[in-house]
Amino acid sequence: MKVSIVGITGYSGLELVRILNGHQKVELVSVHATKEIGTKLSDIYSYLKGICDLEIQSFDSQKIMATADLVFFATPSGVAKELAKDFIAADFPVIDISGDHRLPAAIYEKWYKKAAAEQASLDKFTYALAELTDVKGKKFIANPGCYATATELALLPLVKEKLIDVNSIIVDAKSGLTGAGKVLSESSHFVNVHDNYVTYKLNRHQHIPEIVQELKRFDNNLEHIQFSTSLLPVNRGIMATCYVTLKKPLSNEAVSKIYQDLYADKPFVRLQQDLPELHNVIGSNFCDIGFAYNPVTNVLTVISVIDNLVKGAAGQAVQNLNLMMGWDETEGFPMTPSYL
């Protein structure tokens, strides 16, 4: 299968290159961006020399459709909704890593502060949390956000079984600096991040409605969550610490069984006896989950960790590609995290 990437110079685009390079059933045939046109990708990123020496091309939907079988969009929000139109009209497969096709139009505009995609386009896309969504045969995939992936995987077993007061959910999520994107901002400047801990977009992060939307599918009583986002002085990784009030006390063994039952055949979700740590998933498509119950407060703390660029972006996109095509969902993935 031949694929193209639009938005190649961002972190998610580069991570797609790394993962697809090891995929035996996929060939990357073109990469596209708005700058550095005509330059070899490996001349900009020397670590790719001999691995991906493709020249960066300007965006041309017709050329992509003539040479590839599917296109990934690894673009900032607001871009894919416009550039994907030709592909949608031609019924040409798209996996959108951005947030442009995840939410209803009115909700997108409220949280992203941008005009939404056309309704006809939104209707084509399937929001695909890979562990829970059947995407075989689908052509248009809205890849979940990084914070949303970590939070949904942590909480869905409890919400699905209706074991918690869904309006008691509090999530304290922390991300490595790549989660803030490549464009430099005051909050991501080295001197403000190094040896520091920064909270940003408190109560305003655009992944909040995405999480509510997906959890609400399993318990319609859910109306809101309390959600905070912070930057860690590390390159990669997300840790979502979720606090929920149980409807009735549960033993750790009972909680563990609930998670095991849902994720038993999900190769990228690992339940840890100890509380998860970031470096155990870095460079991988794993989501590690652990928990601890406090019988005094009747609060269950669930912690999930992912690599924001892999499971939170490019990795889940490739996992969804595998599932779309009916391949083994682990196809192309190095199964060992880099750890250090």
Curated annotation (Swiss-Prot):
It holds the Pfam family Semialdhyde_dh. GO terms for molecular function: N-acetyl-gamma-glutamyl-phosphate reductase activity; NAD binding; NADP+ binding. It catalyses: N-acetyl-L-glutamate 5-semialdehyde + phosphate + NADP(+) = N-acetyl-L-glutamyl 5-phosphate + NADPH + H(+). GO terms for cellular component: cytoplasm. Keywords: Amino-acid biosynthesis, Arginine biosynthesis, Cytoplasm, NADP, Oxidoreductase. SUPFAM superfamilies: Glyceraldehyde-3-phosphate dehydrogenase-like, C-terminal domain (SSF55347), NAD(P)-binding Rossmann-fold domains (SSF51735). The keyword Cell membrane does not apply. Pathway: Amino-acid biosynthesis; L-arginine biosynthesis; N(2)-acetyl-L-ornithine from L-glutamate: step 3/4. One of its GO terms (biological process) is L-arginine biosynthetic process. It is found in: Cytoplasm. The active site is at C146. It comes from the Bacteria. Gene3D superfamilies: Dihydrodipicolinate Reductase, domain 2, NAD(P)-binding Rossmann-like Domain. It is an enzyme of class 1 (oxidoreductase). Its EC number is 1.2.1.38. Belongs to the NAGSA dehydrogenase family. Type 1 subfamily. Catalyzes the NADPH-dependent reduction of N-acetyl-5-glutamyl phosphate to yield N-acetyl-L-glutamate 5-semialdehyde. This is N-acetyl-gamma-glutamyl-phosphate reductase. It comes from Streptococcus mutans serotype c (strain ATCC 700610 / UA159).
